[in-house]
Design a protein with these regions (language model features):
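N-terminal active-site beta-alpha-beta segment that forms phosphate/nucleotide-binding
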Residues: 43-193
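Positively charged, low-complexity intrinsically disordered leader regions
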Residues: 1-33, 37-40
Length: 193
């Protein structure tokens, strides 16, 4: 299975879902602005994947910050949050992830953490958002595999499946019972261009 999104060499790397299935292309993001563009232009799709991207974009922006104090770092943090919040107003997980990052940032600020500690806390939280999403997807796959017959015709609506992450239909995840290709028709109806 293609990885949807991850960290590589200090960058956020995501599969360009607009190019699938004909080509496997990866987009590398070095700033929150680049992550925001990837979300806005639908390089990455599916609300949970968008939430993961937002958390990683925030952490990425702080990682590259040269702020000498926590006040300046906080300004950069909230600017990155606002930038990412403007990308997809219907993606619930986007706002959930941003609020989660804000809560952790505020707690770390109240605890008197240094700029380096704040940066580390944000990256750790973004990794946590990602890891929890992967675990949730695996659980959805296990539960779905138990109720969907092996020989089933499945029509999904919007972005369901491995690349959307967290979607209600994840039966073809490698950690769950696979739905054999000849036995199941997987079709998707996009909800927007």
């Amino acid at each position: 299975m293609l990885p949807t999104i991850g960290w590589e060499d200090g960058e956020v790397v995501m599969v360009d879902q607009r190019k699938l299935p004909s080509r496997e292309v990866y987009v590398r993001c070095r700033t929150a602005r680049e992550v925001a563009k990837a979300i806005r232009t639908m390089v990455i799709r599916g609300a949970p994947a968008i939430g993961v991207a937002a958390a990683m974009g925030i952490a990425l922006e702080l990682r590259r910050s040269t702020a000498s104090g926590t006040t300046q770092l906080a300004k950069e943090f909230y600017r990155a949050c606002d930038l990412l919040a403007e990308t997809r107003p219907t993606a619930v997980n986007l706002f959930w992830a941003i609020q989660r990052m804000k809560r952790v940032f505020a707690d770390a600020m109240r605890a008197g953490r240094s700029t380096d500690e704040l940066k580390s806390a944000m990256e750790s939280e973004a990794r946590g958002v990602h890891d929890e999403d992967v675990a949730n997807c695996r659980a959805l796959g296990r539960h779905g595999a138990a109720v969907v017959p092996t020989e089933a015709n499945v029509l999904t609506h919007c972005n369901a499946g491995a690349l959307a992450t967290g979607a209600p239909l994840r039966l073809d995840h490698p950690t769950s019972r696979s739905v054999p290709e000849p036995d199941a028709l997987r079709a998707q109806r996009p909800t927007r261009g």
